[in-house]
Amino acid sequence: MNRRALIISYYFAPQNTIGAIRPTKLAKYLTRLGYDVTVLCGTGMDGKRDAILEKDARELHDVRILNEWNPLRALKERRKSAAPAAVSAPPADTAAPAKRGGLLHRLADSAYIYLRLWTDRSFQHLAVRELKKLEGPFDVVFSTYAPLSVHQAAFWAKKSGLARLWIADFRDEVGMPFRWLEPFQRRYMRMLRKNADLLTAVSNGFLEMMDFSQTGRMLSNGFDREDLPETKNEPARTDDTFRVVYCGHLKEGRRNVACRDIRPMFRALKKAADANLLSLEQLRLVYCGDESELFRAYAAECGLEACVEDHGKVSRAASLALQREADVLLMASWYLRGQKGILTGKLFEYMMMDKPVICCTAGDLAGSELKQVLAETGMGFCCEEAAGESDRQTLEAYTAELLRRWQGKQPLMQEKKEAAVEQYHYVQLAQKLDGWIQELEREDA
């Protein structure tokens, strides 16, 4: 008889958001492993649909979308229909965290966060109500944070006997927006440690920050080559340009975390152009995302504004198409004493492109997991601010070598380690999760 798995994730297909990818892919590949999968999820914030995830969801037979009370979504929809979005100017110091001053701004931010908490509470109540309709038992409930409510609903499923085992997963670290909520956070974390049969997170850094290092296990994000269109359907590139592609966010919505800083790569490219390794007419800095002005500001500061090719916010399919056309894929992150766990899902999406990946990592610590993964897989190089001049010189040398290969029409990707890369395919990650479930069943027998 097939194992039964219950997945609780606010973010899920067909939502067009990065948080929906992980649970959707795990559900898809657990289904292919023979699991009967039931999913409880929310409706998302903006109603936009990801056609790729929508296709994945067709393999699932029981996805229950809960329409929680969400005044923020309604407000967003009203604003969107009332007027086109205004383009915001870049911050004066793009390397500093964006700050909103003034009492009215602080009150507005507090009201927004307060409503988010009540929206989360609404999802929890709807999820528990839906759980009461299900026939058990499920062999396992897998809940993936954020928000808070997913684990609270999963705790109810475990406590009520609806699910025999509970795996509590984290794609982000748990944090509270207000100091007065910190006692609740401590109780929440105690509940997880006491009742979850297994704690998993997308990185070892997150496990460490949440004090799960001794008991938790890393289940990283990954990639799915089925997301890519067939190569034969894509026209071959004919232009003679060196395309550096950045997809996604630049600003960070975390306290005490600066904007993602890609200027080290831009400076390395400008230095290469000054050394006649390529002309600025041959260079394209390609961006897709909703922070075009900041991307342009970074490029202008490095003398590369004329090289920018801005696509704005695009669908995931369009983003993947731009990545396929890249010569180099660029990303950025941070590694701080209080923020060690950043192994972004964009890294693994980039991995399936067979293109060199360059990451610029800000922060006061060296030796990030991002740097380790890029080194172990041979997929590229991570330049860390904390490593100082050594990493900057290595980045310049690596960029120059890529340009020499490009000018000589040689393959740019020459150091890739296939086996190391394949461990991040969602097929492998679902098999790893299946193995843990079977291990927990043996321990519980």
Feature-to-residue mapping (PLM):
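A conserved catalytic-core segment of Leloir-type glycosyltransferases
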Residues: 41-125
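Conserved catalytic-core segment of nucleotide-activated headgroup transferases in glycan assembly
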Residues: 224-225, 236-300, 310, 314-316
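Acidic anion/phosphate-binding donor-loop and adjacent secondary structure
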Residues: 51-52, 72-77, 180, 223-241, ...
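N-terminal subdomain of nucleotide-sugar transferases
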Residues: 1-72, 198, 268, 272, ...
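Nucleotide-sugar-dependent
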Residues: 18, 254-260, 317-321, 329-348, ...
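A charged, aromatic-enriched C-terminal amphipathic alpha-helix characteristic of glycosyltransferases
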Residues: 385-396, 403-439
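Carbohydrate-associated surface elements
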Residues: 202-205, 222
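Membrane-proximal helix-turn-helix segments that form the acceptor-binding/catalytic region
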Residues: 25, 118, 122-132, 149-152, ...
